[in-house]
Amino acid sequence: MKNVKIALTKGRLEKKAIEIFKTININTRELEDKGRKLIFNCENEEYNIELFLVKAKDVETYVEYGAADIGIVGKDTLMETNKEFYEVLDLNVGKCKFALAALPSFKLDQGYNRKKIATKYPNIAREYFRKKGMDVELIKIEGSVELGPIVGLADAIVDIVETGNTLRENGLVVVEDICEISARMIVNKASMKTKKDEIIKIIENVSEVIRQ
């Protein structure tokens, strides 16, 4: 049985993925009492798995370069970049959406001034406005993008919305939904050939859980 390395996004998706892994009998004991560890041995009679926790944006890099065979990451991260791997499963967890949001007075199709849009996801925002045939100025922000319209930096924002509470608390409203997103499983292209049996087994078992 070949060793399969899985890169997992820290935080909210980590917990959801661990629940799925437990359901298919992957050994998650070390993950449940991890302390400051980043690498975990999940080996048992059914699987020979090594799992490590990384930031969302790094999951793709580990998988693309083969340091990880499988990755669990949000679709938002995949949409913003253009890296080489297979996207094999929608895990149906970590569901949220991309949306255009602004102060209630904002009107997308009014005025002649070029709109300023604050976002952590410039590529996604650029494609959204390109499809609308609109020329906008994108302002990349790493922190709380909700501040943009409030302090006058931007007219609106493009960001992930889960419950909408953060928007409401800051006086913003959703102008338009852009797309739904959720957690995905990605696989290194070379690993799909060299560790095909082990990886297909994981994909099929996870698929069965998702369908239930």
From Swiss-Prot:
Cell compartments where the protein resides: Cytoplasm
GO CC, one annotated term: cytoplasm
Keyword Transferase in record: yes
Source organism superkingdom: Bacteria
Name of the top EC class for this enzyme: transferase
Family matches, as SUPFAM superfamilies: Periplasmic binding protein-like II (SSF53850)
Enzyme Commission number, as recorded: 2.4.2.17
Protein name according to UniProt: ATP phosphoribosyltransferase
Molecular function via GO: ATP binding; ATP phosphoribosyltransferase activity
UniProt record similarity statement: Belongs to the ATP phosphoribosyltransferase family. Short subfamily.
Function: Catalyzes the condensation of ATP and 5-phosphoribose 1-diphosphate to form N'-(5'-phosphoribosyl)-ATP (PR-ATP). Has a crucial role in the pathway because the rate of histidine biosynthesis seems to be controlled primarily by regulation of HisG enzymatic activity.
Catalysed reaction equations from the record: 1-(5-phospho-beta-D-ribosyl)-ATP + diphosphate = 5-phospho-alpha-D-ribose 1-diphosphate + ATP
GO biological process per UniProt: L-histidine biosynthetic process
